[in-house]
């Protein structure tokens, strides 16, 4: 039950009635009409800009049109009054009959309250993490992993058919470096003193088990082979081992994928799909042989003064056409990405979301251009950039990990503070802003720790319900059973504030999904938790506001219905974020 969508329909009906009466012109564009909370809660429960955005085309002054619309809205059931403010803003106050309907919807729909049909089942591919399989996941990967997973959950809750995908970068030079690093550990496992790890190889201890496994399987035989012979075998073993570790790290964060896609699969096997994608674009005129002009200002990384295979990305808004082959004839990374995204289109994904590190920001335009080209303009690619995470402990920067050799691993962070703290705090700031993550602060049991504050609100609600079950043994235990309680008795200012917040959850879900901003969910939950804690604290000072009133069974049942509603929406939002809604704090 989306209150704002319901009243947006009422506004459209009011406008249609005015058209039918010949008061205003027909065929008005209602796309910019919104119904939202007023900036000042004292102005009412809802506000609309309808008159302000329609007045010119309607042929009336904004305030005159506002008064006409207000007159129609005033007859809607559940409306207490409608005011016109300033030049033509419309404020709507709801009466006491409306909020019980909203709360009853929360109680009967449970965790599905707020679930939206916004996506209408549209297929969307969300690709995230896609870390090189060259080492353990680190804290930088962690933020992108949590963001991507929460975004996928949010899109699913908003009605999209979501596929979660991981792109395994197993075809570049970095995996050959991985193989050479693993081979060094193989020699070490055979008893050879390898000394200090040479520059250019991966120094972490995480490849020691790979070397031991190779030694156990092959003995010294690999040492007798040339690099050309041993490298593919060692590379495959190292990648497989790293991907097992990556999957385990992601599982520790509560993250799983529907698809793991190998980059190497694009250029091996019976069909060279990278070459095929290039030739398809050549046939449509979007690939040509030519020379790039010398760079102006800042150097262009992949510029070479030679005849080369180029993609016409400037036709799609990019700054310069992009090379698809290197001077040695091998494909550029961009060419592989074109083929990969073409594969997504071929699988039926016309809506794609990629989650990348902020350092890839310069790559966005060319990739969006490529998606337009390979799909004939049918598909869209949205890219969400993830800023860096700075790790602290009690205000002091955290030093590198011994295991990885150069960074703090994701598993170390999860093991120290727990999955819930990591996930919630990674989502308590917009993804394009840097994040300071303090290992000590995220496990504090205080209101300054957002994850504790929100989880405690859910646990407090459950505690109230347990206490009520002892006081009133004959009251029902299931939330849905409270939908028939005398909910109209919820008329205290704090109770109405909570009801307004619950009513805004469906709208918030659609807004967050539309903007691809799961942090809005964590902000909403923190606000709901704050209002719930505030109402509980008011009851400490004013006994008549307590949730359990021993001598008033009806009022108690109404307030317990509200507690159930708060717990339900908190649990629903936490589920979208992939965070546990705990019943008791430990």
UniProtKB/Swiss-Prot annotation:
Specify the domain of life of the species encoding this protein: Bacteria
Has the keyword Ribonucleoprotein been applied to this entry? no
Question: Which cellular components does GO assign to this protein?
Answer: cytoplasm
Q: Does the keyword rRNA processing apply?
A: no
UniProt motif ('HIGH' region) ranges: 131-141
Cellular location of this protein?
A: Cytoplasm
Keyword vocabulary terms for this entry: Aminoacyl-tRNA synthetase, ATP-binding, Cytoplasm, Ligase, Nucleotide-binding, Protein biosynthesis
Enzyme class, first EC level, given as a word? ligase
Q: Catalysed reaction(s)? A: tRNA(Arg) + L-arginine + ATP = L-arginyl-tRNA(Arg) + AMP + diphosphate
Do you know which SUPFAM superfamilies this protein is assigned to?
A: Anticodon-binding domain of a subclass of class I aminoacyl-tRNA synthetases, Arginyl-tRNA synthetase (ArgRS), N-terminal 'additional' domain, Nucleotidylyl transferase
Q: What is its EC number?
A: 6.1.1.19
User: What terms describe the molecular function in GO for this protein?
Assistant: arginine-tRNA ligase activity; ATP binding
* Gene3D superfamilies, alphabetized: Arginyl tRNA synthetase N-terminal domain, HUPs, Isoleucyl-tRNA Synthetase, Domain 1
* InterPro entries the record matches: aa-tRNA-synth_I_CS, Arg-tRNA-ligase, Arg-tRNA-synth_N, Arg-tRNA-synth_N_sf, ArgRS_core, DALR_anticod-bd, Rossmann-like_a/b/a_fold, tRNAsynth_Ia_anticodon-bd
Q: Which GO terms describe its biological process?
A: arginyl-tRNA aminoacylation
Pfam families the UniProt entry points to: Arg_tRNA_synt_N (PF03485), DALR_1 (PF05746), tRNA-synt_1d (PF00750)
Family of this protein: Belongs to the class-I aminoacyl-tRNA synthetase family.
- Provide the assembly information: Monomer.
Matching PANTHER family: ARGININE--TRNA LIGASE, CYTOPLASMIC, ARGINYL-TRNA SYNTHETASE
Q: What is this protein called?
A: Arginine--tRNA ligase
| Source organism of this protein record | Xanthobacter autotrophicus (strain ATCC BAA-1158 / Py2)
